[in-house]
Amino acid sequence: MKKIIRVGIGGPVGSGKTAIIEVITPRLMQRGIKPLIITNDIVTTEDAKQVKRTLKGILDEEKIVGVETGACPHTAVREDPSMNIAAVEELEARFPDSDVIMIESGGDNLTLTFSPALADFYIYVIDVAEGEKIPRKNGPGLVQADILVINKTDLAPYVGADLSVMESDTKVVRGDRPYVMTNCKTGEGVEELVDMIMRDFLFTHSEIK
């Protein structure tokens, strides 16, 4: 059976996780990648509805599923990811020719990581509006993620954040692990992020040719 790569996408509330999914999905599809999407909310499926609206006419809405976890975001993707695993397995069974399934966690703090039983890789999203010091906070989500996304770079002048300092601090705490700075409104850094996903997740670890 074909291996469908599972990619977790985590980060604090409002960092732009959903927006990242919305901008990378059509770009992945333009490169021949067939995606599936799962979103997590604690008491609603609002993110899934938002993604369906944004990607209407681009991705079949049956390939976008919302999971109402009823629990802390990290619990649903790490300590007890059973609800998400069930959703993943159901989507994979319905669409076995897919290449990647993106699993967006609910918004959480810098300690959020994904269980290896749920995700093969994960992307962690922070945003400039959280403050210049965020990379120095050194949380496991930020440090251990396979790719770190520093989103909303356009907000830097409004919150007094120096992007060069954020980038320098990121290199210190992450070493050689990849990161990218993005602006989903302008598309800045988005193609670079897609390049990373293709290179590090898909071409290297799947049957995509």
Swiss-Prot record:
It is found in: Cytoplasm. GTP binds at G11, P12, V13, G14, S15, G16, K17, T18. GO terms for molecular function: GTP binding; GTPase activity; nickel cation binding. The keyword Chaperone applies. Signal peptide: none annotated. It holds the Pfam family cobW. The keyword Electron transport does not apply. It comes from the Bacteria. One of its GO terms (biological process) is urea catabolic process. Transmembrane segments: none annotated. Keywords: Chaperone, Cytoplasm, GTP-binding, Nickel insertion, Nucleotide-binding. One of its GO terms (cellular component) is cytoplasm. Gene3D superfamilies: P-loop containing nucleotide triphosphate hydrolases. Homodimer. UreD, UreF and UreG form a complex that acts as a GTP-hydrolysis-dependent molecular chaperone, activating the urease apoprotein by helping to assemble the nickel containing metallocenter of UreC. The UreE protein probably delivers the nickel. Facilitates the functional incorporation of the urease nickel metallocenter. This process requires GTP hydrolysis, probably effectuated by UreG. Belongs to the SIMIBI class G3E GTPase family. UreG subfamily. This is Urease accessory protein UreG. It comes from Edwardsiella ictaluri (strain 93-146).
